[in-house]
Amino acid sequence: MTNLTPSLEDYLETIYLLQQGSNEARVRDIATARAVKASSVSPALKRLSDLGYLTYIQRESIRLTESGKIAARRIYARHVLLFQFFNDILGMPAEKAREEACGLEHALSDEGMDRFVQFFESRSLLSEPATNSSQDPQNPCASCPAHKTIPHTTLDKIADGHPVVVAQIRAKGAKRQTILDMGIIPNITLIRTASTHDGIRVNLNNHELFLSNEQVHSIVVIAHHTH
């Protein structure tokens, strides 16, 4: 995606988020979300249209093309990972974490993204440590908190309609990166919506994705539970 500047990536991401639950976004909605004048939105939309990332007719709604959706999901996945790290791990306030993620998401390489994913994967199947009040002078570790592995399974074993939280991606190399770039990363919620002979459809951020059988078998999930 070398033909996309950080600014154009931001526009794609904004449109993608506006289209959650809808297939449309309007110029004034984009301008409001980006805190810019409507007159500055049109040139960016025209450029994205020329590059094949969206369809745009003046005064009408904007729709992302398939390549536009792929590009938007890729950049948004990086944003979510970075936000999780700054907010959940480092304890940065949400608004500040969001600003940091917005600034860094454009520069995060595939390798950098994968390292963040590995970090969250290493945490995702561990429950909170259970405190052990016993003190054994012969075995100092007896009082150390012990983590328990959370029950998990792969996405192919989940019934349609059930929400799950992604824990790990077991695919390797380019196949793994393809899944990550779809936005399927640790701690996000998926809902399996339908099955076909060659894969399944899932709902992610109110957008529908198709996953092949091979991809489905490589996605480790935890059953979603509400509090």
Model-based region annotation:
Residues A35-V36, R59, M92:
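The short coil/loop that forms the "turn" connecting the two helices of the helix-turn-helix
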Residues S39, E95:
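Key DNA-contact positions within bacterial/archaeal DNA-binding proteins
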Residues S49-I57:
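A short, conserved structural fragment
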Residues T32, S49-D50, D88:
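Alpha-helical residues within the helix-turn-helix
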Residues E105-V164, Q168-G173, G199-N203, H207-H227:
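C-terminal regulatory/oligomerization modules of transcriptional regulators
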Residues E60-H79:
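Basic, amphipathic "hinge/linker" alpha-helix immediately C-terminal to the N-terminal HTH DNA-binding motif
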Residues T2-V36:
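N-terminal helix-turn-helix DNA-binding core of bacterial DNA-binding proteins
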